[in-house]
Amino acid sequence: SRNKGWKELPSWPGEPRGYAVSTTQSDGFDKCFYLFSGRNYKADGYINTLTDGYAFNPRLNSWKKLKQSFPVMAGNALSCGANHILFLGGVPQLIPGSDDHPGFDNTIRLYHTITQSLIKKEVAPYPISVTTNIAQKGNTFYVGSGEVKPGIRTPHVLKGEIIPFEKKLGIVN
């Protein structure tokens, strides 16, 4: 029956892509599906690195283009807190592979879905794998084995913890 099981949703209003990053998070009203970055293979062989982002709201059955640029292709994303998305690593641009390749981006970024602000939180002192999966249990997350340079995969698993932010009312308290 077409009323049960899988259902095709509207396509996002951007280019087709591979190596995209996605997660779910609240936009302040609804739980939405977020799609970021990726690459598009053109017919002439050119590979276009994408840094756009979109939010799909299932209640409204519509996509919204996000304001920021997201240089996180093939990286990892996870929801944290009520309205944040944490980005771990990624590929900001394609660089031809060689022994001298610097490796992929180790930047940790934080996106706020209500204010649509993206900040560079910190740079990890070790390689963050791309083209891999992330698993989360509570505030602990694991980044599985993945690629740290073109064609170089690591057997390492990274473990991280999201430390909840202490909310305060202001200077008085």
Residue ranges and their predicted role:
Residues 1-173:
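Kelch-like beta-propeller repeat domains
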